[in-house]
């Protein structure tokens, strides 16, 4: 008899999970969030050891996995870029086989999707994708939990992603939304439209869920009847040399109050996976302002601090949703079907 449909599975990309499974994980996240708020212990991973592999640096992902593991009674061990050899002095396969004998679960945040897939293939333990260049699945659970908390549902809502339409967050929002029945609009310049295969994948899921997929560079078409406006940084990690080009290309796709008003929905919410470059209160922000004359990038400070903003709720939800994924895949919970 199968005790859990999740036990032992890796969480590498949203497309690997059904709508019912993703909805279950979002619901479990809400439950674990409630337990946390009421200070009720939930040590589903007591005695477990979790490896946190970070090829790319992070604030939210590292903090979320660390606190989630501790709340679940597990011991997290951080291994940064200087601590792991993945493909450098030791193959990913060999590293995976070693870590799988020492740890009960592995988180990986890095560049290559193939690398996280190899870790899952050869470690023999659940592997969780904390971000790769292609997908950002743990972010999606937090995003759609935040949307559900604000609207009480997901199906039939419209989420508009503004900016670089070919990055990992755009890919994941598009596919996950299509699976969950959320209309997803990508508002982006043609040069940065999502890859054809990603759009086709999303359209396939949308046919099943009844969702709508729209890729456009027209602001009026993009934000009409929007419930959620979402943006991300204009330059992803590893692409810093393209900054001048991106600023010029993406300035018309900035989330500002004019765009918010264009949506015509006072109940609209704004999301951002963070960090956000909305002012010059950072070394990076000052540098960009000096070099390019831009003091606010993907979102204006006005929108970032407005009544529409939910990004700090969204950031907190990283912890609760990551906790749900780890508990479901490693905690021997009784989930015979969803």
UniProtKB/Swiss-Prot annotation:
Superkingdom field: Bacteria
Signal peptide from the UniProt entry: none
Record-listed carbamoyl phosphate binding positions: 58-61, 85, 109, 136-139, 273-274, 318
Keywords linked to the UniProt accession: Arginine metabolism, Cytoplasm, Transferase
Pathway(s) annotated for this protein in UniProt: Amino-acid degradation; L-arginine degradation via ADI pathway; carbamoyl phosphate from L-arginine: step 2/2
Residues where L-ornithine binds: 168, 232, 236-237
Pfam families linked: OTCace, OTCace_N
GO molecular function (one): amino acid binding
Catalysed reaction equations from the record: carbamoyl phosphate + L-ornithine = L-citrulline + phosphate + H(+)
Main location: cytoplasm
GO biological process, one term: citrulline biosynthetic process
Subcellular location: Cytoplasm
UniProt-listed InterPro entries: Asp/Orn_carbamoyltranf_P-bd, Asp/Orn_carbamoylTrfase, Asp/Orn_carbamoylTrfase_sf, Asp_carbamoyltransf_Asp/Orn-bd, Orn/put_carbamltrans, OTCase_ArgI
Keyword Repeat applies: no
Cellular component, GO, one term: cytoplasm
HAMAP family listed in its UniProt record: OTCase
Sequence similarity: Belongs to the aspartate/ornithine carbamoyltransferase superfamily. OTCase family.
Designated name of the protein: Ornithine carbamoyltransferase
Organism: Streptococcus pneumoniae serotype 19F (strain G54)
Lineage, highest ranks first: Bacteria, Bacillati, Bacillota, Bacilli, Lactobacillales
Gene: arcB
């Amino acid at each position: 008899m199968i005790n859990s449909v999740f036990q032992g599975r890796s969480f590498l990309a949203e497309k690997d999970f059904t709508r019912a499974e993703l909805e279950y994980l979002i619901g479990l996240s809400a439950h674990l969030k409630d337990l946390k708020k009421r200070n009720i212990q939930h040590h589903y991973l007591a005695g477990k050891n979790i490896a946190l592999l970070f090829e790319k640096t992070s604030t939210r992902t590292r903090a979320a996995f660390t606190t989630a593991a501790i709340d679940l009674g597990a011991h997290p061990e951080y291994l940064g870029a200087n601590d792991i050899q993945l493909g450098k002095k030791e193959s990913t396969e060999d590293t995976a086989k070693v870590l799988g004998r020492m740890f009960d679960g592995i988180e990986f945040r890095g560049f290559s999707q193939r690398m996280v897939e190899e870790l899952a293939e050869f470690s023999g333990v659940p592997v969780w994708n904390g971000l790769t260049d292609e997908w950002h699945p743990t972010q999606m659970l937090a995003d759609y939990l935040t949307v559900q908390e604000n609207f009480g549902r997901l199906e039939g809502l419209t989420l508009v992603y503004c900016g670089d339409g070919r990055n990992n967050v755009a890919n994941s929002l598009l596919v996950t939304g299509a699976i969950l029945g959320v209309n997803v609009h990508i508002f982006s310049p043609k040069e940065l439209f999502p890859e054809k295969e990603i759009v086709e994948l999303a359209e396939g899921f949308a046919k099943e869920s009844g969702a709508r997929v729209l890729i456009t560079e027209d602001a009026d078409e993009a934000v009409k009847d929007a419930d959620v406006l979402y943006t991300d940084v204009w330059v992803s990690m590893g692409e810093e040399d393209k900054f001048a080009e991106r600023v010029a290309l993406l300035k018309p796709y900035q989330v500002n109050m004019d765009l918010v008003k264009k949506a015509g929905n006072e109940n609209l919410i704004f999301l951002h996976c963070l960090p956000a470059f909305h002012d010059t209160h950072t070394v990076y922000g000052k540098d960009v302002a000096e070099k390019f004359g831009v003091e606010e990038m993907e979102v204006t400070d006005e929108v970032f601090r407005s009544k529409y903003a939910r990004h700090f709720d969204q950031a907190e939800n990283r912890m609760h949703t990551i906790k749900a994924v780890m508990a479901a895949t490693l905690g021997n919970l009784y989930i015979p079907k969803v």
